[in-house]
């Protein structure tokens, strides 16, 4: 008889509206313009998604000067790009489409607004993440990047100066709260974003993990090692009671021996990971264990971002 495992499935999980839109944009471009369609940077941080789109005719590049045939369309990734990138595309006479998530575009607009008001801008985010690079490239003025509470303390700004802050969309809700608290403590005149910059999907997926983490001996987060929202889910699972939590980048290579003395497993998928990978993981576990699956009750997300009309076939 197979060993029994209790599976706790977090919900909501998997693709968010911005990821859905970005992938749909690449597919629509392939339908309308044929192969190849160039994509600047991974459209979303997920190997499965990228490989699938490659097989359909997408060619992934990091810089526009890598485009061999300048008559072919190019799509910018969901993470957003500095203003210099669309300008370069215009200079090269490229047909381009911008798949930046609308929630990231909102932050770009906030940065531009604060810059026009001549407020120093603090960006809470992870250095070298594509989203952060894109946000910092919305203005020629200096943006002060902070990753920790300690970074806030070191900022070379006057405490009575009117300052503004924005955040990366895929941060830990808890960590960001601590940093924002420090910003407000350190400075007397802080202008906040009108709405929280951490996106609904990041928040919802972290909350879903928090609800079940304490039931779990082991937590599996399906996602990529270069995906900020995936890594934050691993941290949240550990911080909220799961004895162990790991990132699963490749279901096929997951070693099942790690579950030898385990009874309760939590599973979620990051906002850039498709539900098909959750199914694949559960099927793999079913083939080796007797599973009791506990699916979380949750409200379905009803957010949808439209693909630009000019991409429709």
Q: Predicted segments — roles?
A:
Residues 1-265, 269, 275-313:
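The feature marks the mature, well-folded catalytic cores of soluble enzymes
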């Amino acid at each position: 008889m197979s060993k029994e495992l209790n599976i706790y499935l977090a919900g909501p999980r998997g693709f968010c509206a911005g990821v859905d839109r970005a992938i749909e944009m690449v597919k629509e471009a392939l339908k309308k313009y044929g192969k190849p369609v160039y994509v600047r940077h991974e459209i979303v941080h997920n190997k499965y998604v990228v490989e699938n789109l490659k097989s359909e005719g997408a060619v992934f590049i990091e810089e526009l000067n890598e485009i061999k045939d300048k008559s072919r369309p190019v799509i910018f990734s969901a993470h957003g790009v500095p203003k210099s990138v669309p300008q370069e595309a215009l200079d090269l006479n490229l047909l381009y489409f911008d798949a930046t998530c609308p929630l990231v575009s909102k932050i770009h607009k906030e940065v531009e607004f604060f810059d026009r008001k001549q407020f120093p801008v603090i960006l809470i985010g992870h250095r070298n993440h594509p989203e952060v690079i894109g946000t910092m490239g919305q203005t020629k003025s200096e943006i002060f990047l902070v990753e920790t509470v300690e970074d806030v303390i070191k900022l070379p700004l006057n405490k009575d100066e009117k300052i503004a802050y924005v955040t990366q969309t895929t941060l830990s809700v808890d960590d960001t709260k601590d940093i924002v608290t420090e910003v407000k403590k350190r400075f007397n005149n802080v202008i906040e974003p009108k709405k929280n910059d951490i996106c609904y999907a990041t928040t919802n997926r972290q909350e879903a993990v928090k609800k079940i983490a304490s039931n779990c001996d082991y937590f599996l987060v399906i996602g990529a090692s270069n995906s900020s929202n995936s890594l934050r889910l691993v941290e949240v699972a550990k911080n909220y009671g799961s004895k162990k939590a790991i990132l699963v980048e490749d279901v096929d290579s997951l070693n099942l021996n790690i579950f030898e003395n385990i009874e309760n497993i939590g599973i979620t998928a990051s906002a850039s990971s498709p539900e098909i990978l959750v199914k694949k993981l559960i099927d793999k576990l079913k083939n080796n264990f007797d599973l009791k699956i506990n699916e979380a009750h949750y409200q379905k997300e009803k957010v949808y971002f439209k693909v630009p009309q000019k991409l429709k076939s």
